[in-house]
Amino acid sequence: MGVANDSSPEYQWMSPHLNYFKNFNKETLLKIEENDYINSSFFQQKDKRFYPINDDFYHISTGGYGIVFKIDNYVVKFVLEAIKLYSPMEIMAELTVPKFLYNNLKGDEKKLIVCVWAMGLNYKLTFLHTLYKRVLHMLLLLIQTMDGQELSLRYSSKVFLKAFNERKDSIKFVKLLSHFYPAVINSNINVINYFNRMFHFFEHEKGTNYEYERGNIIIFPLTLYSADKVDTELAIKLGFKSLVQYIKFIFLQMALLYIKIYELPCCDNFLHADLKPDNILLFDSNEPIIIHLDKKFVFNERIKSALNDFDFSQVAGIINKKIKNNFKVEHNWYYDFHFFVHTLLKTYPEIEKDIEFSTALEEFIMCTKTDCDKYRLKVSILHPISFLEKFIMRDIFSDWINGGN
């Protein structure tokens, strides 16, 4: 079950949070709950009651190497790096690869890439872990006070997450956060949203022995959604006839992007290495996107999809040390699309309703347990890019071939 380490008698005694919460009990919390004041930015962002009332950094995601916030029209990603393994210049793929592709692609396909606006290298990022611990302790002590329990910084991961998830959508709990977050945390970085993801990152994914010392800061444009967030209702709202048509749309745009990249000189080694729906972002599209192969593909939709998160990517002479040693065999575009199709089928079981499309995707990956582990190819299957080009010429994608004519 796992119990935290912040439980030594010395730490418990000196904790300012512990001493602060000794001034409160269930009755005083009830009085706070009865007040009218509520800061709507402490609702979860998926909650319709959420509203960013301050110019704060709002936590929107944590996973892998990145802790992501949004502020105004920007997305700011803090990437904790193993600086001892790589020099700062060896961990710039997220900047250099998309910029290289954008500068070399000549047609509308370049609109399907997310380029970093700015990147700062080798910053001290210890404040993120410190902030996380402060917020965790505040939540622990607040929940204990609500339940009339003895105050302690010892906790079980399972018990804490259950208690937090049960309360996070409650208006009474949000009223308490509206009072205690400014008083105890006093920061313009709001990590209450998706706090369970940050908890998993620091407590499990990176482990207690991980060094949270240094890393990079990356600034992106703010997106409408990541592709995995679109459900049937939103797909219709975005102008698609169905969720499956939307899935075909993002698959086709990514396929066209890859085909055009592989047409570039010396770029037939391009790998993204993490092609999946949550690494595809959706932006407004104010004009048609037209991409020419043997046939013309025309997209008149009011959104476009764009590939993001090139942290593990490589292309041409830009070799990524993060993935170089992980691949035991040679791979090309098919490695990415094999993983992509698996994740599409997992994310969207609705694909099964379209027999022609689902059958085509199943035939596309055609793998066994000896070939594939957790959707990742273990063997070298180097289909030429013409394999992908033939696939997208099928009637499945007739809505966009020659403008749907």
Curated annotation (Swiss-Prot):
Record-annotated active site: 274 (proton acceptor)
Cellular compartment(s): Host endoplasmic reticulum; Host endoplasmic reticulum-Golgi intermediate compartment
Binding site for ATP: 60-68, 84
A GO cellular-component term linked to this record: host cell endoplasmic reticulum-Golgi intermediate compartment
Domain Protein kinase: from-to ranges: 54-405
Modification note: Phosphorylated in vivo. Autophosphorylated in vitro.
InterPro entries in the cross-refs: Poxvirus_ser/thr_kinase, Prot_kinase_dom, Ser/Thr_kinase_AS
Molecular function as annotated in GO: ATP binding; protein serine kinase activity; protein serine/threonine kinase activity
Name of the top EC class for this enzyme: transferase
Keywords of this entry: ATP-binding, Host endoplasmic reticulum, Kinase, Late protein, Nucleotide-binding, Phosphoprotein, Serine/threonine-protein kinase, Transferase
EC numbers: 2.7.11.1
Family matches, as Pfam families: Pox_ser-thr_kin (PF05445)
Reactions catalysed according to its record: L-seryl-[protein] + ATP = O-phospho-L-seryl-[protein] + ADP + H(+); L-threonyl-[protein] + ATP = O-phospho-L-threonyl-[protein] + ADP + H(+)
Family the entry assigns: Belongs to the protein kinase superfamily. Ser/Thr protein kinase family. Poxviruses subfamily.
Protein's job: Essential serine-protein kinase involved in the early stage of virion morphogenesis.
The name this protein goes by in its record: Serine/threonine-protein kinase 2
The species this protein was found in: Vaccinia virus (strain L-IVP)
